[in-house]
Amino acid sequence: MPIIATIEQLEAIYGQPGEASTVKVANRITPPYRVLIDKSPFAALATCGPEGLDCSPRGDRPGFVRVHDERTLMMPDRRGNNRVDSLRNIVRDSRVALLFLIPGSGSTLRVNGRAQVSADADLLASFKMDGKAPRTVIVMTVEEIYFQCARAIVRSDLWNPDKRVDPKTLPTPGQILADMSENRVGGEEYDRAWPERARQSLW
């Protein structure tokens, strides 16, 4: 199987991007890009570390990623599985990327930059939700930001409610855990307890 191994080979196949693909790139958060961030309730956080790459889902109420200034984003580290893979990566390699999604919109927003992890008490308190503060906040310096064309969203028909997958056709978290652990953890009881456990630990 022929493998593409050089930039020249790639450009011979794809050519050069059009002006619209390059002029949209900024090194700061422009007013239109701020609107997209403020409207987004979900982002994927990509990080890298000595063990490899990680991509973590991040979600909260719209605007959960705070625009501190035109070069700085702040994102609370809400409750999760406590693996802290992303944070472990950031403290050793500051390179990060974010991909914002906005329900109903074909536009996605890509942000590349560097990040630090802060446990400043006043900063944590400013992100309290239902009286609960995050344990840390990710502070990101924006180096590159631009919106992505809508073709992937259009092709996938992502926001079409008629295309939603029936959850009953998917393995449950309890089933996956039972399969991976030879039934030591997970199972039906895990799935039964999950909704209430999640409700009590969202923040």
Predicted segment positions?
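Binding-site signature for planar aromatic cofactors or substrates
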Residues: 1-203
